[in-house]
């Protein structure tokens, strides 16, 4: 049975409407940029630094220079611990839907002498939650002075590799490689000897970039 003139008009209008809706959706899908979510503490939150000079800000500039389309969300909070990051993460995952989650936490746990098994559990859960949300994960390792004994500091340094291996995350073994373990380290830190100066930020990015770049390709 043939279509009436009214039916033809309705179908033509519906097709035109769908075309108006589908075209922007297709364009949006083509231009969607990967999202990199940074969940860290003061080392990633520009503590004591001029705004825009931290390693995360330098990462954004690096992505632009490399013509890599990606958005960076810096959800770092000075003083945060792995427990704090773990509690904040679900909402961040839901809000930003990241493609890569970079976890830079644990240093404040160790400076407070918190139980290492708790730190390890928190990091592992953060990796699992991020992967369950469909994101790749990059864990940034940290080391601390032996304030609580050599065994504590050694075990702390090794737990990042353990979590990365067990949970299938990428790893930068030591974020402050070439900063904290060099002869001129004092020149690269602020007077508190905990937070790196602006001059150290490119070195930190240089440690992160090769691993992160692979995750974004």
Indicate where each model-derived feature is located.
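N-terminal secretory signal peptides and thylakoid transit peptides that target proteins
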Residues: 1-17
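Membrane-interface segments of envelope glycosyltransferases acting on lipid-linked substrates or membrane lipids
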Residues: 8-11, 32, 40-41, 199
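Serine-esterase "nucleophile elbow" of acetyl-processing enzymes
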Residues: 28-78, 88-97
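C-terminal segment of classical bacterial N-terminal signal peptides
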Residues: 20-26
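Acidic/histidine-rich helix-loop elements
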Residues: 48, 73-82, 111-114, 193
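Alpha-helical cap/lid subdomain in secreted, periplasmic
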Residues: 62-64, 68, 86-217
